[in-house]
């Protein structure tokens, strides 16, 4: 562990500086940014080095605070000491150092200053302490004797406020002797990082960013349809372009050729009116463009009457030519002309994004100052448009009527459906955007569209642009029909694949209620087995939207509100699913789902996360004490949950079952089926209710413990120094703006919950057909595997993503948090619901195993759940993660599930 402290305290008029030099065990490879190491080998001297580091920091803090207090008694105002000041009087500062620091200070001159090291030399991580400035006129801070900020190499600041204490015993009894707080309010990104780092009990842990940020795939997607340079086409791109020509380009071209002929003939062949000839020619050009759109640019001829309306359409031809000649065979990120001009006046540093822009001495002179930015694809009419246009502009004519009649009735519906299909295919998003943009421009100004090959347009001599070319704005230009990188494309902060899966939700509902029940269609997608698969697939995006909405609300509200919303909406959908199953006498399905959820959360999910994390790091280490509340509650819930089962096993009695009544040597002992007898009515059922109440109370106590009485460390995390993070904020722009506002998150949460309830009812109604198609499949085994794992796919993806990025502790916390939700919320709710549901039903008509959830499990369920939880907590307590431990968890899950399969065979 590399530690190097730089401690400086303020003097009367000059600054003192002292650096603690220690051995760097893991030097960083960059001189500008320290590198965080997640996977390291065991070091026998690590604890001693940590103790030396903490002792040195403690002595430095004591000296700094003491020196500042004595100084404030003489001077009313303290000068600011900057950590970057290297011209300090070392001998004056050394006179006031304690012995432990003075001995090290004597050697400081012989040690080179690593803060000025070259990039080739390793740079030590260091911290600095400086005093906060005080204002003489500020009476509120008069009682603050001293305040200091600790700087570290990561750009984090930690504000230390000394609290006046009369005796040392008061400091020992006060947990808040030093109050760590932020120098500014938390941004949304820092709130999400704080939740993920502390992972408080009851708060949703979420991997995808809840804040808006610029992604490289967004810029690439914009570049793919707004190219400004000649490209070197690879064979993969050529293959996709040829497929476009065969599957889509040629049929669309035939369609537009036919439309052009119809408009030309109905318009009198240009003899009656010239407008029909113009619109027919426009359709002919569109047909040629769709046949092979690659390498062609679509430009807009500006009209003096519509200059204000068209000023935000595309980019200027002059900017196009300058970028073509300056940056051949390179993707260019198009920004607005105003930003382009601003970069010319104030050149930006050579960052990753700015390096793609033309140099500051570019001779381009922007024509318009408000061209739109292409940093993201927006399928909407620009805000600067004066009005919406659906039938073009200019004077009405017979040709215009013919064109828009055919366009709105035939051409646009076909293009819209094709654009939607290409969007759903994900990899063909470029052509989907091209079709959408073409439809937009055809509705506004079809006669002003022009088409030209890029290679022909780049032959201008020394960027000589004629006045005619100055009146053209480039709208579209693409060289590819598809791209592999589009699986990372996001829409409003959500992955495009998840967005596209929402279409399956609506199709499933339409398929079941309209096509199957109302129209009585008999096709393969109206069979109940097919609908069952569609329902399982539909739960994945709905669970994702519910999880992201809950996480977004939690990050934008208080911790208490976030905990309540997470507890309610994260479980209500699954509780509703299981309640519907109990109403349809599928109690074994519910029982298997409960046990399967626990097994998946404590065995399969951590196992996959450990193996996934081992892909990049052989070993990951974490602090197992951070999950003390979750581990304790997990073991407690397992014990309480199986108390009714233990009572039934001890006092329930047995029945003797003989294979042959005449031969008493071949007999087995088994528990009789649960019935409404005195044991169940007076012992088992009251104990089940008591356990359900105790489990729910444990969840409330856990929330109160972590979010109320012991919550002082949750938000007391260092945040980045505004001066040190300025370049990062300029590059990534705002991290304060959420992807979803609170109102939007609430609407998405309610809508997703409603859709999930509808899908759950359809899913349960199709279970019988699946069991009939697969006779060997037991309802409990179906719930143990399919119902327990498929709806939780989002949790698995989050956990594996955390582990791959070096945070396996969060992955394991996700598993334990979900297992606790099952034990402390879902199981008590099902116990209470089953009692109220059968309250007015005749007892002799109730089958307890299929219509109720009595909290009585078979012995194999107890064995599987208990061994899984103890195996999980044991491995978690070691504080290390590798693929060996992950493999053990996965193998244990497999063998327990196989045992459940044979349990069903034995029960039959």
Curated annotation (Swiss-Prot):
Annotated transmembrane regions: 245-265, 409-429, 495-515, 531-551, 561-581, 588-608, 627-647, 687-707, 747-767, 784-804, 817-837, 852-872, 886-906
Alphabetically ordered keywords of this record: Glycoprotein, Ion transport, Membrane, Phosphoprotein, Sodium, Sodium transport, Transmembrane, Transmembrane helix, Transport, Vacuole
Signal sequence coordinates: none
One biological process term in Gene Ontology: proton transmembrane transport
Record has Transport as a keyword: yes
Ranges in the topological domain labelled Cytoplasmic: 1-244, 430-494, 552-560, 609-626, 708-746, 805-816, 873-885
Domain of life the protein comes from: Eukaryota
UniProt-listed InterPro entries: CaH_exchang, NaCa_Exmemb, NCX_ion-bd_dom_sf, YccF
One Pfam family linked to the record: Na_Ca_ex
Recorded topology in the membrane: Multi-pass membrane protein
Region annotation (Disordered) ranges: 1-20, 68-147
Gene Ontology molecular function, alphabetical: calcium:proton antiporter activity; potassium:proton antiporter activity; sodium:proton antiporter activity
Modification Phosphoserine occurs at: 32, 110, 121
Ranges of compositional bias, category Polar residues: 1-15, 102-121
GO cellular component, one term: vacuole-mitochondrion membrane contact site
Presence of keyword NADP: no
PANTHER family per record: VACUOLAR CALCIUM ION TRANSPORTER, VNX1 PROTEIN
Purpose of the protein: Has a role in promoting intracellular monovalent cation sequestration via the exchange of monovalent cations and especially Na(+) for hydrogen ions across the vacuolar membrane.
Family recorded in the similarity comment: Belongs to the Ca(2+):cation antiporter (CaCA) (TC 2.A.19) family.
Protein's UniProt name: Low affinity vacuolar monovalent cation/H(+) antiporter
Record organism: Saccharomyces cerevisiae (strain ATCC 204508 / S288c)
């Amino acid at each position: 562990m590399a530690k190097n402290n730089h401690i400086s305290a303020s003097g009367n008029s000059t600054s003192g500086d002292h650096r603690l030099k220690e051995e760097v065990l893991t030097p960083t490879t960059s001189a500008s940014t320290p590198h965080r190491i997640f996977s390291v080998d065991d070091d026998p001297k690590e604890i001693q080095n940590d103790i030396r580091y903490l002792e040195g920091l403690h002595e430095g803090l004591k000296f700094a605070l003491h020196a500042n207090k004595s100084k404030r008694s003489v001077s009313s105002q303290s000068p600011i000491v900057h950590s970057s000041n290297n011209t300090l009087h070392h001998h004056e500062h050394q006179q006031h150092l304690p012995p432990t620091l003075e001995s090290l200070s004597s050697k400081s001159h012989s040690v080179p200053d690593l803060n000025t090291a070259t990039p080739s030399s390793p740079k030590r991580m260091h911290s600095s302490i400086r005093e906060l400035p005080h204002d003489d006129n500020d009476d509120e801070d008069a009682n603050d004797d001293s305040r200091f900020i600790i700087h570290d190499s990561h750009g984090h600041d930690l504000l230390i406020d000394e609290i006046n204490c009369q005796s040392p015993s008061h400091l020992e009894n006060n947990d808040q002797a030093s109050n760590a707080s932020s120098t500014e309010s938390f941004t949304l990104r820092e709130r999400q990082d704080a939740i993920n780092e502390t992972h408080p009990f009851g708060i949703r842990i979420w991997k995808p960013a809840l804040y808006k940020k610029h992604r490289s795939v967004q810029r690439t997607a914009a570049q793919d349809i707004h190219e400004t340079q000649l490209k070197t086409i690879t064979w993969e791109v050529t293959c996709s372009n040829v497929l476009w020509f065969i599957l889509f380009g040629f049929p669309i071209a035939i369609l537009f050729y036919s439309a052009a002929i119809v408009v030309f003939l109905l318009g009198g062949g240009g003899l009656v009116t010239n407008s029909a000839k113009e619109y027919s020619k426009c359709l002919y050009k569109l047909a040629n463009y769709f046949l092979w759109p690659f390498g062609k640019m679509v430009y807009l001829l500006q009209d003096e009457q519509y200059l204000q309306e068209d000023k935000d359409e595309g980019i200027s031809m002059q900017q196009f030519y300058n970028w073509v000649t300056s940056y051949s065979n390179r993707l260019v990120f198009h920004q607005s002309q105003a930003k382009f001009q601003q970069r010319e006046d104030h050149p930006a540093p050579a960052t990753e994004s700015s390096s793609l822009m033309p140099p500051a001495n570019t001779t381009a002179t922007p024509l318009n100052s408000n061209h739109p930015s292409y940093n993201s694809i927006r399928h909407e009419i620009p805000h600067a448009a004066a009005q919406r246009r659906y039938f073009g502009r200019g004077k009405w004519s017979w040709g215009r009527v013919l064109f828009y009649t055919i366009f709105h009735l035939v051409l646009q519906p076909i293009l819209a459906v094709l654009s939607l299909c290409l969007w759903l295919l994900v990899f063909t998003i470029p052509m989907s955007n091209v079709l959408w943009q073409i439809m937009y421009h055809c509705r506004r100004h079809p006669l002003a569209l022009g088409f030209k090959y890029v290679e022909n347009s780049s032959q201008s001599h020394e960027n000589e642009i004629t006045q005619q070319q100055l009146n053209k704005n480039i709208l579209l230009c693409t060289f590819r029909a598809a791209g592999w990188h589009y699986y990372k494309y996001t829409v409003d902060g959500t992955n495009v694949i998840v967005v596209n899966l929402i279409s399956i939700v609506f199709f499933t509902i339409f398929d079941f209620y309209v096509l199957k029940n109302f129209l009585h269609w008999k096709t393969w997608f109206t069979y109940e087995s097919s609908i069952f698969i569609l329902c399982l697939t539909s739960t994945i995006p709905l669970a994702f939207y519910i999880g992201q909405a809950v996480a977004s609300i939690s990050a934008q509200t208080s911790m208490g509100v976030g905990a309540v919303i997470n507890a309610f909406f994260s479980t209500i959908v699954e509780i509703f699913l299981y309640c519907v199953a109990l109403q349809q006498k599928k109690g074994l399905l519910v029982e298997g789902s409960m046990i399967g959820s626990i097994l998946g959360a404590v065995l399969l999910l951590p196992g996959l996360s450990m193996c996934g994390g081992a892909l990049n790091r052989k070993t990951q280490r974490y602090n197992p004490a951070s999950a003390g509340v979750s581990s304790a509650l997990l073991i407690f819930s397992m014990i309480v949950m199986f108390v009714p089962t233990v009572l039934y096993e001890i006092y329930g009695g047995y029945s003797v079952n003989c294979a042959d009544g005449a031969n008493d040597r071949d007999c087995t002992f088994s528990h009789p089926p649960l019935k409404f007898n005195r044991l169940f009515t007076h012992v088992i059922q009251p104990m089940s209710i008591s356990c359900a109440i105790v489990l729910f109370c444990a969840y409330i106590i856990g929330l109160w413990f972590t979010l109320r009485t012991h919550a002082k460390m949750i938000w007391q995390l260092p945040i980045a120094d505004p001066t040190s993070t300025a370049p990062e904020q300029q590059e990534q722009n705002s991290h304060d703006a959420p992807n979803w506002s609170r109102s939007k998150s609430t609407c998405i949460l309610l809508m997703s919950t409603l859709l999930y309830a509808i899908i759950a009812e359809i899913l349960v109604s199709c279970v019988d057909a699946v069991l009939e198609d697969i006779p060997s499949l037991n309802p409990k085994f179906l719930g143990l595997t399919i119902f327990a794992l498929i709806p939780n796919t989002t949790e698995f993806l989050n956990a594996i993503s955390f582990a791959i990025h070096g945070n396996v502790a969060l992955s394991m916390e996700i598993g334990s948090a979900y297992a606790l939700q099952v034990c402390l919320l879902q199981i008590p709710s099902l116990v209470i619901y089953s009692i109220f549901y059968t309250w007015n039903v005749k007892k002799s008509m109730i089958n307890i195993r299929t219509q109720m959830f009595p909290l009585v499990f078979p012995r194999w369920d107890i064995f599987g759940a208990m061994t899984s939880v103890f195996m999980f907590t044991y491995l978690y307590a070691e504080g290390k993660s590798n693929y060996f431990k992950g493999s053990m968890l996965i193998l244990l899950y497999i063998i327990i599930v196989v045992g459940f399969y044979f349990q069903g065979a034995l029960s039959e």
